[in-house]
Swiss-Prot record:
Organism: Francisella philomiragia subsp. philomiragia (strain ATCC 25017 / CCUG 19701 / FSC 153 / O#319-036)
InterPro entries: NADH_UbQ_OxRdtase_su1/FPO, NADH_UbQ_OxRdtase_su1_CS
Pfam (any one): NADHdh
Name of the protein this chain belongs to: NADH-quinone oxidoreductase subunit H
Subcellular location: Cell inner membrane
Record lineage: Bacteria, Pseudomonadati, Pseudomonadota, Gammaproteobacteria, Thiotrichales
């Protein structure tokens, strides 16, 4: 029993520590990419080309004093960042990086991930309420409404993938797309593919859906009163969720670790490329799109965000799920 616990703890560390490093350098890439798009240089002072900037940013955050606001609920104030951080990293337990390379290959992997990503909003709402600040509270209320609105659209998109694949296990979904580019679900499920990724941007409170922490309205929203390591936990959770949405989009709609050249004359040429490389390459595309969208689009008004979620995304995904179910039931389309 003890040996099992130790091995499990080791596997968890092998996922969490590299993920934190990826998050750190994702912030560096974000500043460089957005700087280039805005005709700036970006960080270039700490280390060669600014490569040590994320390390020193982390040191700065974790060495800062933790300030607790007057009349705040101290217990909830301290527990909220953990409630935001823990589910964001726990969701990675069921992500397969290649065939057999997964911490826990659950039959209900997608349901588990949907549950974990939904839990993060509790940390945001509790942080807003416990901080004893009107700006924090407004940000928390916005976060709650926004997550509920876009979680439904994401849920319907996931249901469409599950119906098409005939499995809720993530490995099963990837294997159902084997056979090359034309077997990937982004073609027959294109509306669900687009809605899922846009809803993922909204779910992570990123621009142009970042009204939860709109600087011009409520300054920093739910984490305005947080400093030091507590703020860093919210920061780590946000970027881990962005990477999670990117890798899930790759898995559900772009075949995961499957090569795009399967069942083609080029299959033998690219056969040496490991599946994990294909997965990371596809994930990198969506990680870049998060940055591109942030640098390009202005922030929506809150009523526009709600209208987009309830009047466009939810009806669209619901109708497409019905269409996919009928196609699968009557043997029409690319699944037969």
């Amino acid at each position: 029993m003890l040996e099992y616990i130790l091995w499990t703890a080791l596997y968890v560390l092998l996922i969490v520590i590299p993920l934190i490093l990826v998050v750190a350098y994702y912030t560096y890439a974000e500043r460089k990419v957005i700087g280039y798009m805005q005709d700036r240089i970006g960080p270039n002072r700490v280390g060669s080309f600014g490569l040590l900037q994320p390390i020193f940013d982390a040191l700065k955050l974790f060495l800062k004093e933790i300030i607790v606001p007057t009349n705040s609920n101290r217990y909830l104030f301290f527990i909220a960042p953990i409630l935001a951080f823990a589910p964001a990293y726990a969701a990675w337990a069921v992500i397969p990086f290649s065939k057999g390379v997964v911490l826990s290959d659950m039959n209900l992997g997608l349901l588990y991930i949907l549950a974990m990503t939904s839990f993060s909003v509790y940390g945001i709402v509790i942080a807003g309420w416990a901080s004893n600040s009107k700006y924090s509270l407004f940000g928390a209320l916005r976060a709650g409404a926004q997550v509920v609105s876009y979680e439904l659209a994401m849920g319907f998109a996931i249901v469409g993938v599950v119906i098409a694949a005939g499995s809720m296990g993530i490995t099963g979904i990837i294997e159902s797309q084997a056979g090359g580019l034309w077997h990937w679900y982004f073609i027959p499920l294109f509306p669900l593919f687009v809605v899922y990724f846009i809803a993922g941007i909204a779910e992570t409170n990123r621009a142009p859906f970042d009204v939860v922490e709109g600087e011009s309205e409520i300054i920093a929203g739910h984490h305005i009163e947080y400093t030091g390591s507590r703020f860093a936990l919210f920061f780590l959770a946000e970027y881990a969720n962005m990477i999670l949405i990117s890798i899930l989009t790759s898995i559900m709609f772009l075949g995961g670790w499957c090569s795009p050249f399967e069942a083609t004359p080029l299959e033998a040429v690219f056969n040496f490329v490991p599946g994990v490389v294909w997965l990371f390459a596809k994930t990198g595309i969506f990680m870049f799109m998060f940055l591109w969208v942030r640098a390009t689009f202005p922030r929506y008004r809150y009523d526009q965000i709600m209208r987009l979620g309830w009047k466009i995304f939810i009806p669209l995904t619901f109708v497409w799920v019905v269409v996919v179910a009928c196609m699968v039931r009557f043997g029409v389309g690319p699944w037969w």
